[in-house]
Design a protein with these regions (language model features):
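ABC ATPase NBD coupling module
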Residues: 63-79
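Q-loop/switch helix immediately C-terminal to the Walker
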Residues: 91-106
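Conserved ABC ATPase "signature" region
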Residues: 113-131
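Hydrophobic anchor residue at the start of the ABC signature
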Residues: 150
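Catalytic Walker B motif of ABC-type/P-loop ATPase nucleotide-binding domains
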Residues: 161-164
Length: 233
């Protein structure tokens, strides 16, 4: 996933030279103080940000140098959950979910009817009510926005998932729902998952390899499935 990778904003190092290997079907949870760069690290691993130096690879491909369609053709289907939802403000909840399917419609051989069916199915599984399907994100609560974002992340049947603070700001029923989905991903040997969170209930419930990001270094906090090394590790 990371080969001698670094990331910096000017003189501020978020990640110093690091090698990180997460095996196929493996899971990693990254903690760290607020402001340390957990979200940046997550987006770096997902290929949404380019490394300052070194390489980020998913299934042997550098995602920020590869088109989304080429990634899918080479066996990389990414699902990303942003901490605030990350939905497009001018699209309804339903259209936010259908967007990814429409982008890859030719690749997957999907027509409009199948695209809408899959999107509605994903939203319904996440307990988004039909009354919210056509609402813009600004008219949805944080909990609903996160559920819509999670539906968008799931609808392409991803084999790489990246979740930023997935349970932050959620009520208890929504949190329980999200935990169940995370556990399903964790237990699926086809899916590689990286989560950034400081949530103690989530950390305890997930029970996966946990690293702490501190001053640009990844420090091991448990060794259930060790697969990371860096100068401070």
């Amino acid at each position: 996933m990371l080969e001698r990778a670094t990331f910096a904003y000017g003189d501020l190092w978020v990640l110093r030279e690091t090698d990180l290997h997460v095996p196929r079907g493996g899971d990693l949870l990254v903690t760290g103080h607020n402001g340390v760069g957990k979200s940046t690290f997550l987006f770096l691993c997902a290929g949404l940000l380019p490394a300052t130096t070194g390489r980020v690879l998913l299934n042997g491909r550098a995602p920020h140098l590869t088109t989304p369609s080429d990634l899918v053709r080479n066996g990389v289907r990414r699902g990303v959950l942003f901490d605030s939802g990350g939905l497009l403000s001018n699209l309804s909840a339903l259209n936010n979910v259908t967007l990814a399917l429409r982008y890859h419609a030719d690749l997957f051989g999907l027509d409009d009817q199948e695209i809408e069916r899959r999107a509605r199915e994903a939203l319904t599984e996440l307990r988004v009510t039909q009354g919210d399907f056509h609402a813009l994100p600004a008219h949805l609560s944080l909990g609903v926005r996160k559920r819509v974002s999670l539906a968008r992340a799931m609808v392409l049947d991803p084999n790489f998932v990246f979740f930023d603070d997935p349970d932050a700001g959620l009520d208890s029923p929504t949190r329980t729902l999200v935990y169940g989905i995370l556990e399903r991903f964790r237990d699926d040997p086809r899916i590689t998952m990286v989560v950034a969170s400081n949530s103690r209930p989530l950390i305890e419930r997930m029970a996966v390899e946990t690293l702490e990001l501190s001053h640009g270094y990844l420090l091991r906090r448990n060794s259930q499935s060790p697969h990371s090394r860096n100068p401070a590790g």
